[in-house]
Amino acid sequence: RMFSEGGLAEDVFATCDTRYPYVATTYRVTEHWQTGVLSRNMPWLMELVPRQFVEISVELAKEKNLKNGDPVEISSARGKVEAVAMVTPRVRPFKVANSTVHMVGLPWCFGWMTPGVGDSANLLTPTVGDANTMIPETKAFMVNIKARG
């Protein structure tokens, strides 16, 4: 249930909050089925994708002084997740109104109960959704990223 009595959203919104300057999205990975509840119990699949990671652009990695494999913390208005940085040209900054906007991406196949290291990316996502379908909004939300350690 996404709305309290009286129809007000129960979530914390963080649009244009300078503490969370980067756009984040979530996605699946080929190696783990959906949330990973079945595939994370298979050793050969865990060997391929053993832990939570966050894809970041080469440009953002330089800006934040991060290297591939560095431990990082991703935070939003709703929570924090620990992951490993995956510096990649797959994710690139884009321009909005002459401003550079960085985007990061996290898989949502990690969680609490099965093997594998990492928190669920859904700890960061808002619990709002379409009023008619109740489909949650997990594809665009604001985060910050910093080195751990």
Describe every region a protein language model picked out.
Residues 19, 28, 35, 39-149:
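Long, contiguous, secondary-structure-rich segments that constitute the structural scaffold
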Residues 1-40:
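Long, low-complexity segments enriched in small/aliphatic residues
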